[in-house]
């Protein structure tokens, strides 16, 4: 049984969503720490910057927790004062996605364990395969994804995996926290973005970072985006001659399988991806 300390550095959670997440997590066998007081704050942030930062520091400093679990995404991670590197790397595991892509990049760079997967409030909506995938990732066990590609029997060797929300990754450009994409499988997903915004974010990443040197780009779900968003993204990636796969079970829907930043992965000629765990 895994114990999670809860934190919030982004937007506040609606009471019904919070309650549903708590009930789902407890029913799945997780032990949970206390909910930070600032989670109910009004406005677009779950409390002021210091209150949100304190919730993260408390979660990371816990000696009883197996991992620190973000309650919700939204916005706020990038403006939250972060704890020292010793808390980020001291054997800590951090779980979240969406706005938390920012924190995952920092935790990974500091030597901590960054897991891209459901936040607490989205865990209530996660399908059973996604819940099993989260347990497997937390345990460091291998997982398999079936991807699709139009590259025929394209097969690439093992490489580490990173990625997350496209819009958030684009905002990391020009900061000390922007990850190195070269030689990695990079997983991208997004939610509620118009075609031109997706185009702009990806184009900016390709021109202003080393994303064009990625081992390959793996596209997840583009939820609540206009129809045709995923094919558009695939065309944009292929225009840069970067190997591309689609239909990764990652995103803002019921299907959101966890992956660990930096874990090794390989893809065979049939599009089966093996994430080897860590």
What are these regions (language model features)?
Residues 221-278:
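ATP/nucleoside-binding phosphotransfer catalytic cores, i.e., glycine-rich phosphate-binding loops
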Residues 73-89, 232:
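Short Gly/Thr/Asp-enriched flexible loops that form oxyanion-binding sites at enzyme active sites
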Residues 1-64:
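ATP/NTP phosphate-donor binding region
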Residues 112-174:
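Conserved anion/nucleotide-ligand pocket segment
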Residues 13, 17, 160-193:
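Conserved beta-alpha junction segments in alpha/beta enzyme cores
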Residues 177-229:
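Internal helical hairpin/lid segments
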Residues 84-106, 113-120, 241-245:
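Short, acidic/small-residue loops that bind anionic groups at enzyme active sites
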Residues 67-78, 97:
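N-terminal glycine-rich "phosphate-gripper" loop used for MgATP/nucleotide binding
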């Amino acid at each position: 049984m895994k114990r999670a300390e809860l934190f919030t550095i982004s937007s506040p959670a609606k009471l019904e969503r919070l309650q549903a997440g708590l009930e789902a997590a407890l029913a799945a066998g997780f032990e949970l720490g206390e909910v930070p007081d600032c989670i109910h704050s009004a406005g677009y942030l779950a409390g002021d910057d210091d209150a949100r930062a304190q919730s993260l520091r408390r979660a990371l400093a816990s000696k009883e927790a197996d991992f620190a679990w973000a309650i919700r995404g939204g916005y706020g991670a990038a403006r939250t004062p972060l704890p020292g590197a010793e808390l980020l790397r001291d054997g800590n595991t951090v779980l979240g996605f969406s706005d938390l892509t920012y924190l995952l990049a920092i935790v990974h760079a500091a030597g901590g364990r960054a897991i891209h997967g459901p936040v607490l409030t989205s865990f209530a909506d996660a399908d059973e395969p996604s819940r099993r995938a989260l347990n497997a990732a937390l345990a460091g066990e291998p997982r398999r994804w079936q991807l699709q590609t139009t590259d025929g029997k394209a097969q690439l060797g093992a490489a580490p995996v990173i990625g997350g929300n496209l819009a958030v990754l684009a905002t990391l450009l020009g900061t000390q926290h922007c990850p190195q994409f070269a030689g990695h499988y990079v997983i991208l997903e997004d939610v509620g973005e118009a075609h031109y915004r997706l185009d702009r974010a990806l184009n900016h990443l390709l021109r202003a970072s080393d994303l064009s040197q990625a081992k390959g780009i793996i596209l997840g779900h583009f939820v609540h985006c206009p129809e045709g968003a995923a094919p558009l993204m695939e065309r944009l990636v292929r225009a840069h001659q970067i190997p591309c796969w689609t239909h990764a079970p990652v995103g803002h829907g019921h299907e959101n399988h966890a992956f660990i930043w930096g874990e090794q992965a390989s893809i065979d000629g049939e599009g089966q991806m093996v994430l080897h765990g860590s």
